[in-house]
Amino acid sequence: MRTRRAPRRRSSIAVQRARGGAPAAARLRAWALAAARPGCEVTLRVVGAAEARKLNRAFRGRDYATNVLSFSYSPAQGDIVLCHPVIAREARAQGKSLAAHYAHLVVHGMLHLRGRDHRRAADARRMEREEIRLLRRLGVGDPYAIE
């Protein structure tokens, strides 16, 4: 007698793009799904610098716009906020394509929702290895490689 596996629960990724210039919603969703926990419900929001700064100040006590913020509400639910102006500026400064930098930060944010962090050096190395592995699957190069 063969045993049946439980069907894999589908993840739900909603995308809200309040800023032009960001990658298409389908691409953002695909990058998030690559790092998603089965059955998760996540909203990706692309915002401007003023909103990112306000959220960073309110939730992290840091008075500047940052590239990505992750908000986990439960093991299966969360929001990721991506600041387009900061991401675009960083991509230019690092000589990366905008799409590659967005892919990295979406995967990075999704890993935070899964409980990963980079406060300690060992945790940061583990998280970076996981990001590199997931991005490689997506056809995106190592975001930490120095060229």
Regions found by a protein language model. Give the residues of each.
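An acidic/histidine-cluster motif and surrounding catalytic segment
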Residues: M1-A103, L111-E147
